[in-house]
Amino acid sequence: MQQDGTQQDRIKQSPAPLNGMSRRGFLGGAGTLALATASGLLLPGTAHAATTITTNQTGTDGMYYSFWTDGGGSVSMTLNGGGSYSTQWTNCGNFVAGKGWSTGGRRTVRYNGYFNPSGNGYGCLYGWTSNPLVEYYIVDNWGSYRPTGTYKGTVSSDGGTYDIYQTTRYNAPSVEGTKTFQQYWSVRQSKVTSGSGTITTGNHFDAWARAGMNMGQFRYYMIMATEGYQSSGSSNITVSG
């Protein structure tokens, strides 16, 4: 991400979020994520089908969900029960929303639906590990910018070939507070256009390890995410695995 002056750098250098809280400031792990607010801690709850949310929160709606926005533009996430969710955003700042699991790990993740950005955004599997602290992305779709970094090779998985990249974030917000940490990326060479896909996470984790990109403990969440940056668009995703 530390490619000064590029759009890739700017997507992670977004304006200060509400209450000074970044999405990386979520305190993750085992379904006990909490969001600090001006009035205290908002603990995860249980949402119900067809609930639309516009404020930062985590919880359970058939599956674990996470929603974060820096407050720019108009952004909403609709929880449709089970593994389904949809998003709508207009002239957003930066946001990330998705459903998945309160802890990451080796899974065969299946998804279907659509991801329709006008501008910069990712359709991706997204998560964190601890000790070492790593932020990881497996990107199957993107908008106007395809993410890159220091090239580490390729991995073939689930009918596609992914380029592997590594980047570093310095003194940046994370699930463990402000720290310097690595980012690991698998970015599909061609977008998934069929509306459905499979991500076998272990194939990527193993390829990263072969490239010397060591992961840590899966203490934090892993979601099939929609992310947008200074863009508009919509998505409708159902995830299972």
From Swiss-Prot:
Post-translational changes noted in the entry: Predicted to be exported by the Tat system. The position of the signal peptide cleavage has not been experimentally proven.
Gene Ontology MF: a single term: endo-1,4-beta-xylanase activity
Region of interest (Disordered), ranges: 1-22
Record Pfam families: Glyco_hydro_11
Biological processes annotated in GO: xylan catabolic process
GO cellular component, one term: extracellular region
Domain (GH11): residue spans on this chain: 51-240
Keyword Cell membrane: no
Annotated keywords: Carbohydrate metabolism, Glycosidase, Hydrolase, Polysaccharide degradation, Secreted, Signal, Xylan degradation
Secretion signal span: 1-49
Protein localization: Secreted
Keyword Hydrolase among UniProt keywords: yes
Catalytic function, reaction form: Endohydrolysis of (1->4)-beta-D-xylosidic linkages in xylans
Pathway of action: Glycan degradation; xylan degradation
The protein's Enzyme Commission number: 3.2.1.8
Residues at the catalytic site: E135 (nucleophile), E227 (proton donor)
Top-level taxon in the UniProt lineage: Bacteria
Family according to the record: Belongs to the glycosyl hydrolase 11 (cellulase G) family.
PANTHER family given in the database record: ENDO-1,4-BETA-XYLANASE A-RELATED
Annotated protein name in UniProt: Endo-1,4-beta-xylanase C
Species this protein is from: Streptomyces coelicolor (strain ATCC BAA-471 / A3(2) / M145)
Gene name tied to this protein: xlnC
